[in-house]
Amino acid sequence: MDGVRNLTVSCASSNTCNDTIDDFRNQVYSTLYSMITVVGFFGNGFVLYVLIKTYHEKSAYQVYMINLAVADLLCVCTLPLRVVYYVHKGIWLFGDFLCRLSTYALYVNLYCSIFFMTAMSFFRCIAIVFPVQNINLITHKKAKIVCIAIWIFVILTSSPFLMSTSYKDEKNNTKCFEPPQXNQAKYHVLVLHYVSLFVGFIIPFVIIIVCYTMIILTLLKNSMKKNISSRKKAIGMIIVVTAAFLISFMPYHIQRTIHLHFLHNDTKHCDSVLRMQKSVXITLSLAASNCCFDPLLYFFSGGNFREGLSTFRKHSLSTMTYVPKKKTSLPEKAQEIYKE
């Protein structure tokens, strides 16, 4: 589901279309995956390092961000295999197991990111819109339970992607990351696609739209205008998560739907084949780029990022200093539980 195969297809005029986009594909994938690997590794590695060092604060936000960073790093570690594959012009060198694992890791990361962002948006909505009624829903322990459930759900439901095996082409070169060739396999992939489309994209997207609408309406009220810090954090999260969905997740799921139906057509125009193959390369790269959005989520929605760095640098001094906390109201306590 995530590759671009070197297709020779029958055109409407019954001529053979031998044009390919191999050079375009290899250059785009190798370049963009290399960039995503570097940015994703150092960005998520840095965020994870700071979060672990300041984990004594134990906020729900930290739990979600740690899990996001871990999911990104696991995916980023497999991207160099893809880079080598496309640098070697579509020849797989690492065996069938790593071929399956690389495909699996990309989709586990993709849908873990979507579900973690959705959970963060939902509980941020609870903390802002209903801080008093549902304060027990946004605790550190509840966040852990939600994250464990997401990991188990995504790992199990993404297991069919492990069927994306390597194979030998007509030149006896080992291939990986290519679309299915048998009609039965195409049907199974199409069913899997629609399940992941609705459960893994459409439903989470609807949830975040509803949550962000409620958050924005609440922030526009006079009672919330006093809490400038909360407003900035919520707005930062809305911007980054919405950008991730519109730039990374949405184009990929739309294009994947069109592409899978396109593969079922017996007659394909050469120009359409080439355009479809190019769109696969671009949208799949955008989907992988979600690894770069997650550090931005921490930088821009985490209002206390600099404070976290300061806490990390001076942790030994802060543990020796006692600063009494002021009494807080229930709405403020809800924000404190979900603080960055």
UniProtKB/Swiss-Prot annotation:
Topology term for the membrane: Multi-pass membrane protein
Family: Belongs to the G-protein coupled receptor 1 family.
Segments in the Cytoplasmic topological domain: 53-60, 131-144, 218-233, 301-340
Cysteine pairs bridged by disulfides in the record: C99-C176
Name the UniProt record assigns to this protein: Cysteinyl leukotriene receptor 1
Functional summary from the UniProt entry: Receptor for cysteinyl leukotrienes mediating constriction of the microvascular smooth muscle during an inflammatory response. This response is mediated via a G-protein that activates a phosphatidylinositol-calcium second messenger system.
Transmembrane segments: 32-52, 61-81, 110-130, 145-165, 197-217, 234-254, 280-300
Glycosylation site residues: N6, N18, N172, N265
GO molecular function, one term: signaling receptor activity
GO cellular component: plasma membrane
Domain of life: Eukaryota
Main subcellular location: membrane
Record bears the keyword Membrane: yes
Matching Pfam families: 7tm_1
Extracellular side: 1-31, 82-109, 166-196, 255-279
Location(s), subcellular: Cell membrane
Keywords, sorted A to Z: Cell membrane, Disulfide bond, G-protein coupled receptor, Glycoprotein, Membrane, Receptor, Transducer, Transmembrane, Transmembrane helix
GO biological-process terms attached to the record: G protein-coupled receptor signaling pathway
UniProt xrefs under InterPro entries: CLT1_recept, Cyst_leuk_rcpt, GPCR_Rhodpsn, GPCR_Rhodpsn_7TM
